[in-house]
């Protein structure tokens, strides 16, 4: 990722801005069931398996800032929320999103995620008008390229 940020520096300086976004490295995503903003189910996603990738992203950003290629203008945590009215709708979303991931989920993690989905589905079925929310903590950095080549 450092190489990619070096290349981005080359094409964006002197007047560009880079918005770098990646999943938070130390916080688990979670699945919630809500009805009228009332939380009736919340569990960490046991299928979370990209912590190392997130740490690599953190280190890459720190590396290019440390080398003076970019100035950190702002950095903040936010939550990327995916809403679904049914478990099938959430599965359809993940089928599209995961199509770009060349790695299959480890069998144990996939099974644990399915068990969580089943528990969420039970709560969803008992709560008319409720919806699922997949909450993914993320980090966003606004970087300005320095004049340094």
Feature names for model-found ranges:
Residues 4, 28-34, 41, 101-110:
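Short, structured coil/loop segments at alpha-helix boundaries
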Residues 66-149:
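Conserved Class I S-adenosyl-L-methionine
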Residues 1-8:
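A short, conserved alpha-helix within the catalytic core of class I
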Residues 9, 15-83:
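Conserved catalytic/acceptor-binding region of the Class I
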């Amino acid at each position: 990722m450092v190489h990619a940020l070096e290349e981005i520096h080359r094409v964006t300086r002197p007047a560009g801005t880079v918005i770098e976004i990646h999943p938070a490295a130390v916080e688990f995503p979670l699945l919630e069931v809500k009805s009228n903003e009332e939380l009736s189910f919340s569990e960490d996603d046991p299928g979370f398996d990209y912590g190392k990738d997130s740490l690599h992203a953190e280190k890459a950003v720190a590396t290019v800032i440390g080398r003076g290629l970019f100035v950190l203008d702002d950095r903040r945590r936010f939550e990327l929320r995916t809403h679904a009215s049914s478990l099938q709708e959430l599965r359809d979303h993940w089928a599209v999103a995961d199509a770009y991931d060349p790695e299959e989920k480890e069998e144990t993690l996939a099974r644990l995620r399915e068990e969580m989905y089943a528990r969420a589905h039970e709560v969803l079925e008992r709560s008319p008008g409720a919806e699922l929310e997949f909450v993914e903590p993320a980090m966003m950095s606004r970087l300005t390229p320095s004049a340094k080549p």
